[in-house]
Structures are given as structure tokens and as C-alpha cells.
Amino acid sequence: MKKTIFLLLFVFAFATLSKAQMYYEFTLPDLDGNDVSFGKIVDKSNVVMLSFWATWCTPCKEEMKKMADIYEKYKGQGFEYVAINNDNQKSVSKVKSFITAQGYTFPVLMDTDKKVFEGYSGKDEMPYSVIINKKKEIISVHTGFKTGDEVMIENEIKAALGIK
């Protein structure tokens, strides 16, 4: 019995670890309701950062503000930042107003049923971000955000882009 439980725990732990390391494609609507294929974004980029957020999440908004600057700095070098909102369907206009008011130019997608978020994270903590390289490998995962984290994230992006 102990062997069986240990084996099941090992298999579950391995499956969770593998899931966290896998990149997978998905399609979500943008703020105008147009379907956007994440696979197409990854195919045309060298490095992509996915960031899951919600309008009620203050650290999420702080991360987005810092990432907007990093996005502008490296987007011409193959970097793409994609913000994926997890608010419910009723909040789409609120999300759109927030993004417009901030002047953000990066793609914002809506994951109102949280399926993509759960597929990547498996947790309910935000912000939750993953950095994906040109080989479509998840090379970094970040949970939460505090001032100063953007320096580490920028260094990871630069390294993935091959910038010294």
C-alpha cells in the first residue's frame, strides 16, 4: 500500500512538473473580440512573456506598468509581451478602459474562464508569468511581483534574446 501511494505521489508530482514546463498553443479573444492564436505570436517572436492578471490585482498592475517599458525597449528585437486578463466576461469593457487609459500597446487577451491560466499555472496566484524562448520552451516562471523584480525579468529577457 505504501509503495502504491508513493508511486502515485511521484507520478502526480512528475506530471505537475512536466505540465509547468510545457508550452502549448491556444486561441483567446483580444479586447475587440477578435480571436488571437498564441502560436502565431510565438512563431514570429524570439522571446515571449505571458503575464496573467486581473483588474483587482494591484501587483499585476505594477508588473504591467514596468513591463510596458521593457516591451517598448525590446519589441523591435523580437520580444513580445502578452497580458492575459482573467476577469469575468462582464469585465471586458473595464479591462479595455484600463488598458486604454494606461496607453499600453502590447496585446491583451481575455481568458474569462481561466482555462489557459489553469493550464499554465495550476495555481490561483497572480500575477503569474512565464517566459518562452524561440524553441518554444518555458525558460522562466514568476509568481507575484514587487518593485525590483523587473530588473531580474529584464535580465532574463535580454539573455534569451542574446543581448549582453
Q: What do the PLM-derived regions correspond to, one by one?
A:
Residues 128-164:
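Thiol-/selenol-based redox modules, centered on thioredoxin-like
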Residues 48-50, 82-84, 130:
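Conserved hydrophobic packing residues within short motifs/helices of P-loop NTPase cores
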Residues 25, 98-134:
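Short, internal strand/loop/helix patches
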Residues 27-47:
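A short beta-strand-turn-helix
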Residues 45-48, 52-56, 125:
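Short pre-active-site segment immediately N-terminal to redox-active cysteine/selenocysteine motifs
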Residues 16-20:
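Sec/Tat signal peptide C-region and signal peptidase I cleavage site
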Residues 4-14:
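Sec-dependent N-terminal signal peptides
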Residues 61-102, 113-119:
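Structural microenvironment flanking redox-active thiols in thiol-disulfide oxidoreductases
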